[in-house]
Amino acid sequence: MSEIKDVIVQGLWKNNSALVQLLGLCPLLAVTSTATNALGLGLATTLVLTLTNLTISTLRHWTPAEIRIPIYVMIIASVVSAVQMLINAYAFGLYQSLGIFIPLIVTNCIVVGRAEAFAAKKGPALSALDGFSIGMGATCAMFVLGSLREIIGNGTLFDGADALLGSWAKVLRVEIFHTDSPFLLAMLPPGAFIGLGLMLAGKYLIDERMKKRRTEAAAERALPNGETGNV
C-alpha cells in the first residue's frame, strides 16, 4: 500500500512532469490557451501513458535490451494513433483544435521517460498506475494553466467544452466577466510562459511551507514532555 501511495504522490505532486521535471513544455505552452484544450490534451496524454506503461511492462521480459527504445517508440506510436482516431471520431472539434499536438505525443519525453525509467522495471499493475498518476499530474498542470489563461484573456471558463464532452457541455461555459476584445498577452505564448512561472513559484512556496511545518512538528515531538522549546 505504501508503494502505491508513493507512486500516486510522486506522479501528482512531488515528481510532477510539468512543474518539477519540466518535460513536455511544447504542448503545455502551446495548447493551454483554454481550459477545454488543456483538459483534452491532458486526458489524451494520460490514456497514452497508462496504456503504453501497461503494454511495455507486460512485454518487458521479452524485449531485447539492445533494441528496447525502438520497440518502445513503436508501441507508443501505435497507442497514440489509436487515441488520435478516437478523438477524430468522437470529438472532432477538439481534434481540429489540438491539431499536430496529438501525434506529437509520440515524441513526448514524459511517455518515453516513464517507459524506460519505470515500466521496463516494474509489474504491469504498478506501471499502469504510474502512467495514470504521471498523466493526471500533467493534466492538472495543463488545466490550471489553461483556466488561468482563458479567464484572464477571454473572461470565460470552459468555452468550447461541447467540443470535448458533447453538446450537453455547453451549459458548463461560464462568463466571469465581459470583454469586447481578448487580452492577447494571456492568450499568446508569452502569457503561457508567465503563467507557468507563477505556477512554479506557487508550488515552490507550498513545498517550502509544508517542509517548515514538518520540521516544526518533528522538533516538537523530539522535545521532552513539558518543554515548549521557547527560551
UniProtKB/Swiss-Prot annotation:
Membrane protein topology class: Multi-pass membrane protein
Main location as per UniProt: membrane
GO terms under cellular component: plasma membrane
Record has tRNA processing as a keyword: no
Alphabetized InterPro entries for the sequence: NqrDE/RnfAE (IPR003667), RnfE (IPR010968)
EC number of this enzyme: 7.-.-.-
Regions that span the bilayer: 18-38, 39-59, 63-83, 86-106, 125-145, 182-202
Subcellular location: Cell inner membrane
Keyword Methyltransferase: no
Keywords: Cell inner membrane, Cell membrane, Electron transport, Membrane, Translocase, Transmembrane, Transmembrane helix, Transport
Biological processes annotated in GO: electron transport chain
Pfam families: Rnf-Nqr
Assembly and binders: The complex is composed of six subunits: RsxA, RsxB, RsxC, RsxD, RsxE and RsxG.
PANTHER family membership: ELECTRON TRANSPORT COMPLEX PROTEIN RNFE (PTHR30586), ION-TRANSLOCATING OXIDOREDUCTASE COMPLEX SUBUNIT E (PTHR30586:SF0)
Family named by the database record: Belongs to the NqrDE/RnfAE family.
Function (record text): Part of a membrane-bound complex that couples electron transfer with translocation of ions across the membrane. Required to maintain the reduced state of SoxR.
Name of the protein described by the UniProt record: Ion-translocating oxidoreductase complex subunit E
Higher taxonomy: Bacteria, Pseudomonadati, Pseudomonadota, Gammaproteobacteria, Enterobacterales
Gene that encodes it: rsxE
